Amino acid sequence: MLHCARRYMLVRPRLLWQSGTCVARFQSSVRTPASEPSAEKGVDEWLEAINELREEFSAKEYLPETSLAPPGQSKVDLLQGSQAGSKIKPTAEQLAQWEALKSVPIPPRKNATLDHITNMIMRHGKKEKAQTILSRALYLVYCQTRQDPIQALEKSLDELAPLMMTKTFNTGVAKASVIPVPLNKRQRNRIAWNWIVQSANQRVSSDFAVRLGEELTAIAKGTSSAFEKRDQIHKTAIAHRAYIQLK
């Protein structure tokens, strides 16, 4: 305890206020080697630099051309320096890349099919979660097929979606009419996606994104059981083709 007290008495901070800045200097009995720079000298230089900046800001208006000038020069032209930096010549490799990519069309910012699928996955307004699920599923499709997952998704929906549905209409007599009705693209995608989700829920994985990715891969390979539903709907529509009303 006495040793700690003596040590505390030997090393005491002495606060110095210089130009509004508090600097703590320690009085120690330990001598520093002459080769090492003094800490107090560095503090003094730092305070002098701060005072010079304060005098410069208070004496006149701040001008970047003057303050940013290199030593030995009173003023620098910032506009000329920025223009000189913008004159960059592309390399031969960059020019070759430009020629190769010049004819490639820029992809659209949004994909209507992806937005539609994301909205059908979304529950309780959690769109970011739906986008994450779809992204993971498409990544699994890419890992297993090594194809563009968006094109694979659009192709799978187009092949799986039915062209028409049958609707029952009351004719006013005892027998009702079953009439085939054509579907637009949005209706076809919705029906196909519902079949994909139903088939995906029958898989064993506990992660919905994994089940969805496996089902999309099966559809891309043509081995999904959802094609049976499409064929059954088409058979029913063909059987009732006599009731189609042409305008």
Swiss-Prot record:
GO cellular component, one term: mitochondrial small ribosomal subunit
Annotated gene: RSM7
GO biological process: mitochondrial translation; ribosomal small subunit assembly; translation
Location of the transit peptide in the chain: 1-26
Leader sequence segment: none
Main location: mitochondrion
Misc note: Present with 1340 molecules/cell in log phase SD medium.
Protein name per the record: Small ribosomal subunit protein uS7m
InterPro entries listed in its UniProt record: Ribosomal_uS7, Ribosomal_uS7_CS, Ribosomal_uS7_dom, Ribosomal_uS7_dom_sf, Ribosomal_uS7m_fungi
Organism: Saccharomyces cerevisiae (strain ATCC 204508 / S288c) (Baker's yeast)
Family statement: Belongs to the universal ribosomal protein uS7 family.
Superkingdom of origin organism: Eukaryota
Role according to the record: Component of the mitochondrial ribosome (mitoribosome), a dedicated translation machinery responsible for the synthesis of mitochondrial genome-encoded proteins, including at least some of the essential transmembrane subunits of the mitochondrial respiratory chain. The mitoribosomes are attached to the mitochondrial inner membrane and translation products are cotranslationally integrated into the membrane.
GO molecular function, one term: mRNA binding
Localisation per UniProt entry: Mitochondrion
